[in-house]
Amino acid sequence: MPTTSRPALDVKGGTSPAKEDANQEMSSVAYSNLAVKDRKAVAILHYPGVASNGTKASGAPTSSSGSPIGSPTTTPPTKPPSFNLHPAPHLLASMHLQKLNSQYQGMAAATPGQPGEAGPLQNWDFGAQAGGAESLSPSAGAQSPAIIDSDPVDEEVLMSLVVELGLDRANELPELWLGQNEFDFTADFPSSC
C-alpha cells in the first residue's frame, strides 16, 4: 500500500500552499482513481490528528466556539502507555503464580477422580442461607475448589513471594520479631528508679 506524507506545517500551524499542492499531487498519484473528496477522506483516515486544512481534527462535533460539544475545554492528547518487555521484579512472582494456578486448574479438571487425593470437585454443603433461594447448589460449589490450603505450591514460588513481600528481611526488622515485647522497661530505665 503506498504511503503518503503529512502536509508540512508552517510556524503558525497551517500548511504552506506549495507543500499542500505537492501533497495533493502525490496523493493523486497514489490514489488516482479517487475523487478529490475521497482523497481528502483518505488523508484524514491516514492522519486523524490533522484535518485537510492543517488544523487539528478531534473527530467530535464542534460548537461555534471550536471546542467539542459536551466538553467544557479541549484536553491535550494523551500518550498511549508504553509496552514494557521487562516487567518489574515484584510482578514476576504474581505472574508465575497465575501461570501455575492455571496449569493446576487444568490438571485438576483432567484428573478429578484419583484415589487418595481429595480433588477440587468436592460437594461441600454450606447449609441454607437466609431466604433459601440463594443457597449454593452442588454444581455451583463444584466449579471452584473450596479449600485454598490444599493446593500444592512450588518452593520456588513461595520463595519469590517471600522476597516480593519483604519477609526475607524479617531478621533485619526488630518490630517483626515474634514474642518481642513492645516496651522493654528493664533496658530503657535504669535500675535505680
Swiss-Prot record:
Result, substituting S16A: Strongly reduces phosphorylation but does not interfere with its NES-dependent nuclear export
Disulfide bonds: none
Gene Ontology, cellular component aspect: cytoplasm; cytosol; nucleoplasm; nucleus
Phenotypic consequence of L165A: Does not inhibit interaction with ESR1 and ER-coactivation activity. Localizes mainly in the nucleus
Source species, domain of life: Eukaryota
Family membership noted in the UniProt record: Belongs to the CITED family.
Subunit details: Interacts (via C-terminus) with CREBBP. Interacts with EGR2. Homodimer. Binds to RBM14. Interacts (via N-terminus) with HSPA8; the interaction suppresses the association of CITED1 with p300/CBP and SMAD-mediated transcription transactivation. Interacts (via C-terminus) with TOX3 (via HGM box); the interaction increases estrogen-response element (ERE)-dependent transcription and protection against cell death. Interacts with ESR1; the interaction occurs in a estrogen-dependent manner. Interacts (unphosphorylated form preferentially and via C-terminus) with EP300.
Protein name: Cbp/p300-interacting transactivator 1
